[in-house]
C-alpha cells in the first residue's frame, strides 16, 4: 500500500466525521474507535506498510484524544485495507483515563440529527469546512488518473488540534439544530459530496477559489 500513513489517518477521520451528523449528545473525546486491518502480508514491503499504518493510527488517535477500543487483524490474499468504526463505549472504560472534557451523560443513535441533502431555503448558506490544514492533493484518485497524474502525492490529514476545533464547533451547531443539512467529504472528494447533497436536484458549484484561499500553488 502506497502512503499507508496518509490512508490510515484519512480513514480515522472519515469514521469520526460520519458520527458528526448523528442524533445524540457527545463530544469527540467521548467516542471510541474500533479498527480492522485486512492485510496481504506476502508482497515485499507490505509488512513495513502495515507497521506504518499502525504507528500512524496510534499517533493520530492520541493527538485527537480518542481511544482505540479494540482491533482486528485479518490476513488477506487480495489486497490491503484498514477500516475504522466510531461509537460510544457501551460500558464505562476501565482501562482508559477519562478526559476532563468528556460529556457527563453522552448518548448517540443511528439516526441523523440533520439530513444529508440540501434543504429548500433561499436564506441558508452552503459552507465548505476543511477539517485539516494540509494542501490539496489528488494522487491516486480517479480524477488524477483521468488527467494522467498517477504519481502525485496522495491526500493527507495530519493536524489533530485543528480537527478537534472544527469537530467541536460543527458538532455543537448540529446538536443545536443550526445546521440544516450536512455531508462528509470523504471517498470521492468534494464532487461526490456535492452530488450526494443535491439528491434529485442539481448544483452549479464554483470551487476555483479553494486553492487560492489556502495559498496553495502546487496542483500535483
Where are these regions (language model features)?
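A general structural motif
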Residues: 103-110, 157-167, 207-215
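Mobile "lid/hinge" segments at catalytic clefts and subdomain interfaces of large enzymes
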Residues: 38-41, 82-158, 171
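A generic local secondary-structure boundary/capping motif
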Residues: 21-22, 58, 74, 112-118
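Active-site pocket-shaping loop/turn-to-helix segments
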Residues: 2-6, 153-162
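Glycine-/charge-enriched secondary-structure boundary and capping motifs
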Residues: 40, 46-81, 92-100, 152-155, ...
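Short, surface-exposed loop/turn segments at secondary-structure boundaries that line and modulate
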Residues: 26-44
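Conserved phosphate/anionic-ligand binding catalytic regions in large, soluble enzymes, centered on
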Residues: 12-27, 118, 122, 180-197
